[in-house]
Amino acid sequence: MDTSSINAQSIFDDNAATLKLSWLTGHEGWERGFSADTVGNATSSADLVGHLNLIHPNRIQVLGEAEIDYYQRQTDEDRSRHMAELIALEPPFLVVAGGAAAPPELVLRCTRSSTPLFTTPMSAAAVIDSLRLYMSRILAPRATLHGVFLDILGMGVLLTGDSGLGKSELGLELISRGHGLVADDAVDFVRLGPDFVEGRCPPLLQNLLEVRGLGLLDIKTIFGETAVRRKMKLKLIVQLVRRPDGEFQRLPLESQTVDVLGLPISKVTIQVAAGRNLAVLVEAAVRNTILQLRGIDTLRDFMDRQRLAMQDPDSQFPGKLV
């Protein structure tokens, strides 16, 4: 990932209001940030932000009341040595939290080395938690996919397929049935955790749905506030096809998945044909996926019944004609 745009200035601008940050000194170092190696070697955002640590270089160092108190109890020689080691690590910036006064020697060294120094009245723990969440978001893997992203029965569903198959019309039908629109045409996905991908709408396309013959529709204005969603976790991909290809299976023996940002996402394929109620089919696919997530697999249950019937043809099953 390109980390050139992530620097002290951008982080300060994005978090100044939330964390009540003040830029004390080191303004010349506004371009300081993380190296690509540092980000690549980090297993999580916890490796990029933390309490004062002289072992891990190139990380955001937060000095709370405990660190300042420890500093005050050191001898002048130890204070000078610790401050020199801290600045030598070349952190993107330093934060003095908890409303504590920044030590004069720290301010002086930050000024001389152009190391940004922020202060905040918030506790060190709160600052670290907030910055870790922020870093995990901006450094998370991202992708933009084409389709209509909807909230159907509380599940994030992406409608995909070739142009002209009626994805937007299907989305409009589902919205009229009480489901919610997240994004149309271009959907921004980001992997925020080890087991989920979140989808949002680009700001330019917020609340808009393009339908051929009608143009752009403002779904929020037409259907109301409850017809749109800010974000949803992607759980199912519904691919619309005009006609089955050679790989299309009417009764697939294994669940289909699509890799999205390194995670396997469940997928179903629905053929578009005259007379087919696609909205009902999509809702049924969503309900079936919900059952599968709960451990209920209808196809596997049927195969188990079939296997038992083949092993014992004379066995009695509910509903068997005799």
UniProtKB/Swiss-Prot annotation:
Domain of life, per lineage: Bacteria
GO molecular function, one term: phosphorelay sensor kinase activity
Catalytic site: 146, 167, 185 (proton acceptor), 250
Coiled coil segments of this chain: none
Pfam annotation, one family: Hpr_kinase_N
Keyword Nucleotide-binding: yes
Listed GO biological process terms: regulation of carbohydrate metabolic process
InterPro entries: HPr(Ser)_kin/Pase, Hpr_kin/Pase_C, Hpr_kin/Pase_Hpr_N, P-loop_NTPase, Ser_kin/Pase_Hpr-like_N_sf
Entry keyword annotation includes Magnesium: yes
Region annotation (Important for the catalytic mechanism of dephosphorylation) ranges: 271-276
Transmembrane segments: none
Reaction equations catalysed: [HPr protein]-L-serine + ATP = [HPr protein]-O-phospho-L-serine + ADP + H(+); [HPr protein]-O-phospho-L-serine + phosphate + H(+) = [HPr protein]-L-serine + diphosphate
Residues at which Mg(2+) binds: 168, 210
Binding site for ATP: 161-168
Protein EC: 2.7.11.-, 2.7.4.-
Something else known: Both phosphorylation and phosphorolysis are carried out by the same active site and suggest a common mechanism for both reactions.
Similarity annotation: Belongs to the HPrK/P family.
Subunit structure of this chain's protein: Homohexamer.
Domain statement: The Walker A ATP-binding motif also binds Pi and PPi.
HAMAP family: HPr_kinase
Protein name: HPr kinase/phosphorylase
Organism the protein comes from: Burkholderia cenocepacia (strain HI2424)
